[in-house]
Amino acid sequence: MAAPRVFPLSCAVQQYAWGKMGYNSEVARLLASSDPLAQIAEDKPYAELWMGTHPRGDAKIFDNGISQKTLGQWIAENQDSLGSKVKDTFNGNLPFLFKVLSVETPLSIQAHPNKELAEKLHLQAPQHYPDANHKPEMAIALTPFQGLCGFRPVEEIVTFLKKVPEFQFLIGDEAATHLKQTMSHDSQAVASALQSCFSHLMKSEKKVVAEQLNLLVKRISQQVAAGNNMEDIFGELLLQLHQQYPGDIGCFAIYFLNLLNLKPGEAMFLEANVPHAYLKGDCVECMACSDNTVRAGLTPKFIDVPTLCEMLSYTPSSSKDRLFLPTRSQEDPYLSIYDPPVPDFAIMKMEVPGSVTEYKVLALDSASILLVVQGTVIASTPTTQTPIPLQRGGVLFIGANESVSLKLTEPKDLLIFRACCLL
């Protein structure tokens, strides 16, 4: 009998401190639904579910017909399951890590280097940059999701410089004036002025940052107490960030970066060198396999200011332009494809109404990982002997060129995400 090429996975949960607690976390709810033996602790954070072969969370295989115990081991011995192009392009490795994130408190403001810079940084400082790969990533909201992403239009930054004197103080009059003067100039002049302003902020002395932040927090708190609305300078968000990261330079970044409020199904794509931070909510995320992160604030960890200021993409764009839109499949009315401009990964979203009794997941020339977010199905393939029951939180590995038939076992809508590589 041929070895199975479609099988369920048991995936790693990461309990980082910023995660949502207990059953407030979508990660915990998915885990509890898919594993009846899972013990969810209400006083512990459930931050990330990892679906892939990353050494710090290689998915486990419990199929008795498979001798390998993890997905990484299995792929190493079943290279053709990746798909011929994927295998050759990515040296026999699964090129992506698929995740669910449940964010309670903001993650650090960060950017990820492109391939060329990653190789250089890894060579120079492997203790901070553990590999030589780039790390593009994409987040698709499962619940209302808030994040910072990319530099705002210059007009908006200039407005904040006028309305927030503490922000202007840290940037300095010269850099701020220069930015105002370049508003009507070409993109290169704008980028240069923006880099100068951001670098001034990032290179400010900690003591001065803390003083200015305290002044701003005091001013906003007094205005809010007096019943005034401070949302024109994101008063509530600033107070919240300061409470979580007192004195942190990242609190001022909200005046530089777009604030995105994603509705379920909306996405943002974070290409190399784009500053970003996840603030709160639940999402599915897919990324290239890398741990390289250059931090900019909202963190107690190492901040490499010179590298950060040098590498960032200083191209302003509106928050609307930062949304990444899926394309609807022509052949399948229930399928949307989020296909970013990188070779490492794509995400497919399948929303199947409960009135449908059977749904076919089409074969791809790529290994893929499928996550059930809503609904209950029984999966079968032409090559599997035993059908595989999957419910909410269930994760299925699908080898290249394998199709899967999903039988809906109850008349409830089905929501599935599938990470793959569309070369």
UniProtKB/Swiss-Prot annotation:
Active site: 295
Cofactor(s) demanded: Zn(2+)
Cofactor: binding comment: Binds 1 zinc ion per subunit.
UniProt KW keywords: Acetylation, Cytoplasm, Isomerase, Metal-binding, Phosphoprotein, Zinc
Residues recorded as bearing N-acetylalanine in the entry: 2
EC annotation from Swiss-Prot or TrEMBL: 5.3.1.8
Keyword Nucleus in record: no
GO CC field: cytosol
GO molecular function, one term: zinc ion binding
Keyword Isomerase among UniProt keywords: yes
Reactions catalysed, as given in the entry: D-mannose 6-phosphate = D-fructose 6-phosphate
Primary location group: cytoplasm
Annotated function: Isomerase that catalyzes the interconversion of fructose-6-P and mannose-6-P and has a critical role in the supply of D-mannose derivatives required for many eukaryotic glycosylation reactions.
Official protein name in the record: Mannose-6-phosphate isomerase
Originating organism: Macaca fascicularis
Organism lineage: Eukaryota, Metazoa, Chordata, Craniata, Vertebrata
Gene behind the chain: MPI
